[in-house]
């Protein structure tokens, strides 16, 4: 009943497709699909306000609101530290459990960690979109992620990379619903080149956060 109330509240009046039956984690669910038409921002590039997002490790995301000339209008640090602490605690328990049991028995605990990671991604994506909408940003800009093929590495590293990917996907969906475009740029030379396209910057040797261009 709660799910149907949510659909009536959030998706009333939207074009609905026939529900699909799905099996997930040995349970069956109904998936409802809706179609919504929105108009994305058409503001001229020179007049645009953008929300630049840096997805980090210690801090979940740093959002910078800026104009085309590089003027910073606002900055927000998004960090769900308690959620990450719980997730990493679960990973620690998985490592200890794995030493004593088979990998098949560990799978259910690993699935739980992935669900926690996805829930964290949803929270971060919602905060990014909300902040961009507050400043009426026309575009949310992310770093382009090279994530083709199988991801290797430790479980903590895998979860972090998956979280970056999921945040971008979720944020793109939420941003489009708010009429905000999403762009991805290569991170190469972003610290070396000036934001106005004039070329390389000159860094202060004593404080690398200060530069001249």
Residue ranges with predicted function:
Residues 28-213:
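Positively charged, helix-rich recognition surfaces that bind polyanionic ligands
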């Amino acid at each position: 009943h709660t799910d149907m109330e949510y659909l009536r509240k959030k998706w009333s009046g939207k074009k609905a497709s026939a529900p699909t039956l799905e099996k997930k984690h040995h349970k069956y669910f109904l998936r409802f699909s809706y179609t919504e038409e929105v108009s994305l921002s058409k503001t001229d590039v020179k007049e645009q306000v953008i929300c630049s997002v840096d997805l980090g490790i210690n801090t979940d995301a740093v959002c910078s609101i800026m104009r085309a000339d590089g003027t910073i209008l606002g900055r927000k640090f998004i960090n769900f530290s308690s959620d990450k602490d719980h997730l990493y605690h679960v990973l620690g328990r998985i490592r200890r459990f794995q030493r004593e049991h088979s990998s098949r028995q560990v799978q259910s605990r690993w699935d739980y960690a992935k669900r926690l990671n996805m829930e964290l991604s949803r929270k971060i994506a919602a905060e990014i979109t909300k902040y961009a909408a507050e400043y009426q940003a026309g575009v949310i800009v992310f770093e382009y992620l090279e994530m083709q093929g199988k991801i290797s590495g430790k479980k903590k590293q895998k979860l972090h990379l998956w979280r970056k990917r999921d945040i971008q996907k979720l944020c793109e969906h939420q941003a489009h619903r708010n009429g905000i475009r999403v762009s991805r740029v290569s991170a190469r030379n972003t610290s070396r080149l000036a934001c106005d396209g004039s070329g390389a910057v000159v860094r202060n040797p004593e404080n690398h956060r200060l530069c001249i261009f």
